[in-house]
Curated annotation (Swiss-Prot):
Keywords: Decarboxylase, Lyase, Magnesium, Metal-binding. Mg(2+) binds at residue 88. Its cofactor is Mg(2+). Signal peptide: none annotated. It comes from Pseudomonas putida (strain W619). Homotetramer; dimer of dimers. This is Oxaloacetate decarboxylase 2.
């Protein structure tokens, strides 16, 4: 088998963005899962930051993971992958200068693309999440990311949460990110095709959706026609693995341990209640989410 180089995988991802068909990204998290994804016909994968947080820390997705810890996980995937892999680079692990370091490290790890989001992370004292950073600061991160890549085929994807602000602000933000040279725009929180059209009619840059399996946005032909090239439907493979591990350990132990649902398993073994209490105590922020204390939506989705 002739293996494709990281540069070739990046070129393949660029071709996908410039194509005419929407592709669904496989949620991958280790060498085995990315090889499975390739064999099952996926043309692109994504290493979710929330999944890496679970793997490394057993913690909710609240920006506790360090850059080095994330890069270690991505490197393991990058070594084995023969499909392009997108890295979830969160907020770039800091300001625009931190973004430059993040791009350099993830490029060496072998990713084909990375997303940079405009969410303010980690959450600040007494700050109700999610809060977006300023448009100019976010655009500066895109400029810095493009400047710091040594392989121009590495795609920089600007990510924004449209549910965290107004339609008008989202339009202004995505226009600024396109002007800054983002290779694609990633949207979180899109409601339906009407909402998608309103958000993207001013853009020529390819679109990526974090969709969570939204039934109102599942028509591949319509997605393709709307210039959507990548859809991420959450990280079901890893969560299914958690459920299977618990069941297998129950059987091996011969224990009469309780039958726990997936949300119950996640809550118990990521210590969600403890993090919620610590957040209230030390950040003076209350959280009502039943899935966790993540500032970016349901823990079970991303």
């Amino acid at each position: 088998m002739i293996e494709r180089s990281h540069h070739e995988l990046r070129k393949a991802f660029g071709d996908l963005l410039q194509g005419h068909v929407c592709k669904f990204a496989a949620s991958v998290f280790d060498p085995i899962s990315v090889r499975m994804a390739s064999d099952l016909g996926f043309e692109v994968g994504i290493q979710g930051g929330s999944v890496a947080s679970l793997q490394v820390l057993g913690a909710p997705d609240i920006a506790l993971l360090t850059l080095d810890e994330y890069v270690e996980q991505v490197t393991r995937v990058g070594r084995a992958s023969q499909i392009p892999v997108i890295a979830d680079a969160d907020h770039g692990f800091g300001n625009a200068l931190n973004v430059m370091r993040t791009v350099s490290e993830l490029q060496k790890a072998g990713v084909a693309a990375l997303t940079l989001e405009d969410t303010h992370l980690p959450a600040r004292y007494e700050e109700q999440s999610p809060v977006l950073i300023g448009e100019e600061e976010a655009a500066a991160k895109i400029y810095a990311a493009r400047f710091s890549r040594s392989d121009d085929s590495l795609s920089i994807i600007a990510r924004t949460n449209v549910a965290a602000t107004t339609l008008e602000d989202s339009i202004a933000r995505t226009a600024a990110y396109e002007k800054a040279g983002a290779d694609a725009i990633c949207l979180v929180g899109v409601k339906d095709f009407h909402h998608l059209a309103a958000l993207t009619e001013h853009l020529t840059t390819p679109i990526m959706l974090i969709n969570y399996g939204n039934p109102a946005l599942c028509d591949v032909e319509k997605l393709s026609a709307a210039n959507v090239r990548i859809v991420v439907n959450g990280h079901a493979p890893y969560f299914s693995a958690i459920k299977s591990i618990y069941q297998a350990l129950r059987e091996q132990s011969g224990s009469q341990g309780p039958e726990l649902s997936l949300p119950e398993l996640i809550s118990k073994y990521t210590r969600v209640e403890s993090y919620r209490e610590w957040t209230k105590t030390y950040l003076k922020v209350g959280h009502d989410s039943p899935c966790g204390v993540t500032p970016r939506g349901p823990q079970l989705c991303n």
